[in-house]
Amino acid sequence: NLVSDIIGSKKHMEKLISIIKKCR
């Protein structure tokens, strides 16, 4: 499903951003 893929990628990006912020 396109919508679920977009939501999933959004959560994935938020997770990556939180990891990057922890490294800084």
Swiss-Prot record:
Domain of life the protein comes from: Eukaryota
Arginine amide found at: 24
Organism of origin: Phyllomedusa tarsius
Record's function text: Antimicrobial peptide. Active against Gram-negative bacteria E.coli ATCC 25922 (MIC=1.5 uM) and P.aeruginosa ATTC 27853 (MIC=23.2 uM) and against Gram-positive bacterium S.aureus ATCC 29313 (MIC=11.6 uM). Has no hemolytic activity. Associates with and disrupts membranes in vitro.
Keyword Ribosomal protein part of the UniProt annotation: no
UniProt subunit comment: Homodimer; disulfide-linked.
Keyword Disulfide bond recorded: yes
GO biological process: defense response to bacterium
Tissues and organs where the protein is expressed, per its UniProt entry: Expressed by the skin glands.
Full protein name: Homotarsinin
GO cellular component, one term: extracellular region
Location of the protein in the cell: Secreted
Result of altering residue 23 to S: Loss of dimerization
Record's keyword terms, sorted: Amidation, Amphibian defense peptide, Antibiotic, Antimicrobial, Disulfide bond, Secreted
Signal peptide start-end: none
